[in-house]
Amino acid sequence: MTDQPAQNGLIPPPTSEPSKAAASAETKPKKRICCACPDTKKLRDECIVEHGESACTKWIEAHKICLRAEGFNV
C-alpha cells in the first residue's frame, strides 16, 4: 500500500487556522471610526452645535447604530 492521505480517495479538510484569520478579519472594521458614517456624523454634529447634546439624542443614537453596523464597538 502507498501512503495516501485517506484510503477512500478524499482529501482531509484543511486546518482551522485560515478560517480563524478570516473570521477575525470580518469582525474588524474596514474603516477608521472618524471616516465611518459621514452622513449621520454630520447631522449629529450640526444638531449638537445648534441645539445642545440633550436635544440631539435621536441623531446621536442613529450615529451609534451606524457605527455598530460598520463593526465598531460603541
Curated annotation (Swiss-Prot):
GO biological process, one term: response to copper ion
Induction field: By copper, salicylic acid (SA), nitric oxide (NO) and infection with P.syringae pv. tomato.
Main location: mitochondrion
Protein name: Cytochrome c oxidase copper chaperone 1
GO MF annotation, one: copper ion binding
Residues spanned by motif Cx9C motif 1: 37-47
Gene Ontology cellular component terms for the protein in this record: mitochondrial intermembrane space
Cellular compartments annotated: Mitochondrion intermembrane space
Record PANTHER family: CYTOCHROME C OXIDASE COPPER CHAPERONE, CYTOCHROME C OXIDASE COPPER CHAPERONE 1
Binding site for Cu cation: 34-35
Region annotation (Disordered) ranges: 1-30
Chain ranges of the CHCH domain: 34-74
